[in-house]
UniProtKB/Swiss-Prot annotation:
Part of the biosynthetic pathway for all classes of flavonoids, a large class of secondary plant metabolites, many of which are brightly colored. This is Chalcone--flavanone isomerase. Catalyzes the intramolecular cyclization of bicyclic chalcones into tricyclic (S)-flavanones. Responsible for the isomerization of 4,2',4',6'-tetrahydroxychalcone (also termed chalcone) into naringenin. GO terms for molecular function: chalcone isomerase activity. The record marks Y114 as: Important for catalytic activity. It comes from Raphanus sativus (Radish). Its EC number is 5.5.1.6. InterPro entries: CFI, Chalcone_isomerase, Chalcone_isomerase_3-sand, Chalcone_isomerase_bundle_sf, Chalcone_isomerase_sf. The gene is CHI. It comes from the Eukaryota.
Length: 247
């Protein structure tokens, strides 16, 4: 299922500013040209010699169809319940809707540094699940190759678009702009899922992004329920009126 197969209205999601990096309310995916809404954003950093050092700031965008899709099981849960729920974030990761990730640099990184750390996290996830195969090993090689000659100064961004079918589109930007097309497409569903899993999943590198996604989706699912109830009431009233006329 994609937004073109099952169009949903774009949720009202205000922009977020995280450590001087602004994430707009919506973006157009370089993989599909679909408009996705901002699910949440947060920093990735480490405690170094008693000081928290921020390396990157990460924004996560979702297809609007994710809201009714997730509402089936998770509507009514609080932000706290969703934040602590591994199955909820797993459902976002594997859900049949498009996702987009924007990773903006706060400190300079080389493509090699970034890609080696990401693939290290991905391989750890696969091995813990017992699903690391030759196909994934080849996808990792391709991922490392795409990043090999890249450098990312502060303010530059790495962009990932995850299709419902499982492809991972990789793009780069030296500023806040998002290119219309990606630099490379890697056809490996597990790699695409693992990139997002490493950010907001069980062993996430950005607890802040995970919290914001839970917070925003809890509110959007609540609003979705109100809209569904209103539509249902309108339909029932219309049916009652129709029956009254027939009688």
């Amino acid at each position: 299922m994609s937004s073109s197969d099952c169009p949903s209205p774009l949720p009202t999601a205000p922009k977020l500013q995280v450590d001087s990096v602004t994430f707009p309310p919506s973006v157009i995916s370089p993989a599909s040209s679909n408009t996705l809404f901002l699910g949440g954003a947060g920093v990735r950093g480490l405690e170094i010699q008693g000081k928290f050092v921020i390396f990157t700031v990460i924004g996560v965008y979702l297809d609007p169809v994710s809201v009714p899709s997730l509402s089936v099981k998770w509507e009514g849960k609080t932000t706290e319940e969703l934040t602590e729920s591994v199955p909820f974030f797993r459902e976002i990761v594997i859900g049949a809707f498009e996702k987009f990730i924007k990773v903006t640099m706060k400190l300079p990184l080389t493509g090699q540094q970034y890609s080696e750390k990401v693939t290290e996290n991905c391989v750890a996830i696969w091995k813990s699940l017992g699903i690391y195969t030759d196909s994934e090993a080849k996808a990792v090689e391709r991922f490392l190759e795409v990043f090999k000659d890249e450098t990312f100064p502060p303010g530059a961004s790495i962009l990932f678009a995850l299709s419902p079918e499982g492809s991972l589109t990789v793009a780069f930007s030296k500023d806040d702009s998002i290119p219309e097309t990606g630099k490379a497409v890697i056809e490996n569903k597990l790699l695409a899922e693992a990139v997002l899993e490493s950010i907001i999943g069980k062993n996430r590198v950005s607890p802040g992004a995970r919290l914001r996604v839970a917070e925003r989706l809890a509110q959007l699912m609540k609003e979705n329920k109100v809209e569904e109830d209103a539509t249902k009431t309108d339909q029932e009233e219309a049916n009652d009126l129709s029956l009254a006329k027939e009688n």
